[in-house]
């Protein structure tokens, strides 16, 4: 081999460790692995319930029930630990007008809040709803978005929720005479009268729900909780 054909020292050093095998092509369209994909997020702390009076005898909400509901709310709402009691039938009186008044957010902004309605009937059945807006008279319009859902406690260890189906937009409708959630074929998913004494619950297209309790019932307790700032 002629000396002129030999690689120079600089070339030999620059080729140190190389092989004749071409490296595998890199797929530039494939995203890099996200190390957080395999990370288990820490559990959320238990919900802190604020607003019950020491003398209140009938309390619907528990930390266990609140945790079940929190599992289904939007992520931004899920992060709030404190739930504030806005209205209690026992503490504030049996009036739908009072319920509406006490639900007005302190800063007028509901974008950072969620609202949980809880009802207990005379047979001890517990059920309710989660909504993205506070309960208020909305004229002749329905309101609420796809984050809303109905829920029920079937027994001490069984919670069931009914999410928005998209079949119609009859999510929440309130007027001075009644409060309602869900609808279709002339039936409400949940309906309460203006005195908060009686109510009805039927299957409805909005949430694809079964009756949340007895279809016609007498009210024992009603609560509304604000989740957020």
Swiss-Prot record:
It holds the Pfam family TLD. SMART domains: TLDc (SM00584). Keywords: Mitochondrion. Residues 59-228 form the TLDc domain. Residues 1-44 are annotated as: Disordered. GO terms for biological process: protein retention in Golgi apparatus; protein-containing complex disassembly; response to oxidative stress. InterPro entries: TLDc_dom (IPR006571). One of its GO terms (cellular component) is nucleus. It is found in: Mitochondrion. Belongs to the OXR1 family. May be involved in protection from oxidative damage. This is Oxidation resistance protein 1. It comes from Yarrowia lipolytica (strain CLIB 122 / E 150) (Yeast). The gene is OXR1.
